[in-house]
Amino acid sequence: MKKVLVQLDTDQHPSPFDAIVAYDAGVDVLLSYGSVTPEQVKDLVQGAFFTRAPNDLSSMAVWVGGSDVSEGEKVLDAVQTAYFGPFRISAMHDSDGCNTTAATAIALIAKGRDLDGRRAVIIGVGPVGLRSATLLRQEGCDVLAVTIPADVLGTDSYRTPRGLAVAEQLGIEAREPSDRAEMEAALEDANIVLASGPAGVQVLREEVWSANPTLELLADYNAAEPLGIEGVEAGDDLVERHGKLVLGALAVGGAKMKVHKACVRQLFERNDLVLDADGVYAVAREIV
């Protein structure tokens, strides 16, 4: 029986990235829907799983994506609400790649290391940064997330990121530094620093992180020049620089692709798997 993946994307055009990776992971048929709202999910999901007997539903799954993480979470909730009795299919949420990226990076950082009690600072309060903060906290880290000030972003039209409110809801300590100096001061006593800023924005200077005596490990999520952390190469795979281990965006990305494909394959091993942030992290811990 063919493996069918129903792609529910909250954007107008379903992600070609997610579609191609699905095929590379072994999906036979991809049914892609764009501009999906939670209200539309029930008919789409039930229209899919009613075509097969309950014993055959492991050959069908749902992928939730798009650029809006909050909307994606609502769609995933609606997918699960559409289930009843034996009629359920596995589902995964990875809007904007937030879950696979964060899970992979933290799995790489945590591999073979005891993170309990370590101080971690996340620069940037977007979806990937906050997912990373949550996972680091689960590993026992003392976590601080900081926003990126206007002088670092290079803009005169700064607005308070909505991620601050999300951080508060998640119980993550977050600060909004007024300028670069205040942001860099927040890195004092940090053992781990993750740069999760916009593409092409350098958020951390080499002279700052190289001189930090407590800093042990840095990771950069930005693969576009200039990179997020000065002095780190995109391909750095936990190599040592200035006495600290550094992880570049391409090293994270390569492992992320393996995790992404493994997650898709696992969706078809049973019909009741839900891969949210925690579920994806469990897969990442097995893969990296």
Where is each model-derived feature located?
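A glycine-rich, Thr/Ser-enriched phosphate-binding loop motif common to dinucleotide/cofactor-binding enzymes
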Residues: M92-A110
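Glycine/charged-rich beta-loop-alpha catalytic/anionic-binding loops adjacent to active sites
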Residues: F84-M92, R241-L245
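N-terminal ligand-binding/catalytic initiation module
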Residues: M1-F87, G279-V288
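Short glycine/serine/threonine-rich phosphate/pyrophosphate-binding segments
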Residues: A102, P127-S132, V201-L204, L227
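Conserved active-site and cofactor/substrate-binding residues in soluble primary-metabolism enzymes
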Residues: S35-E39, S70-K74, T100, T104, ...
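Glycine-rich phosphate/diphosphate-binding loop of Rossmann-like nucleotide-binding domains
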Residues: A110-I192
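Adenosine-phosphate binding glycine-rich loop
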Residues: A224-V288
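Rossmann-like adenosine-cofactor binding region
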Residues: I172-V246
